[in-house]
From Swiss-Prot:
Pfam families: Frataxin_Cyay
Entry-linked InterPro entries: CyaY (IPR047584), Frataxin/CyaY (IPR002908), Frataxin/CyaY_sf (IPR036524), Frataxin_CS (IPR020895)
Gene3D superfamilies hit by this protein: Frataxin/CyaY
Function: Involved in iron-sulfur (Fe-S) cluster assembly. May act as a regulator of Fe-S biogenesis.
The protein, known as: Iron-sulfur cluster assembly protein CyaY
GO biological process: iron-sulfur cluster assembly
């Protein structure tokens, strides 16, 4: 059965909240310098060097798109997991690794 828009937004919002919570913990524990801007369908992370990671919800496709300085990625929800459409990698480990590579900040997601 296809996912409804309401289900998509609930899953995506839960994931956005988990990322925000992990970053706030890193700010507290590691004195990490990250600006978090959550606005509508977009979660933007800006690091001390000015680089950004932008995560946004693509409602018509029921996908999460991520832009890092290393490239753009599309994640779809498959069997209870957000998976990269190209290589099948899971979303949360990908975000964790991208933040580490881009900023040196270690998150617990």
């Amino acid at each position: 059965m296809a996912m409804t828009d309401t289900e998509f937004h609930q899953l995506a919002d839960d994931m956005f909240q988990a990322i925000e919570t992990a970053i706030e913990t890193a700010i507290d524990e590691q004195d990490a310098d990250v600006d978090i801007d959550a606005s509508g369908n977009v979660l933007q992370l800006e690091f001390v060097d000015g680089s950004k990671i932008v995560i946004n919800k693509q409602e018509p496709l029921h996908e999460i798109w991520v832009a890092t300085r290393f490239g753009g990625y599309h994640f779809g929800y498959v069997e209870g997991k957000w998976l990269d459409g190209r290589n099948g990698g899971e979303f949360m480990p990908f975000v964790q690794d991208s933040i580490l590579r881009q900023s040196g900040i270690e998150l617990s997601l």
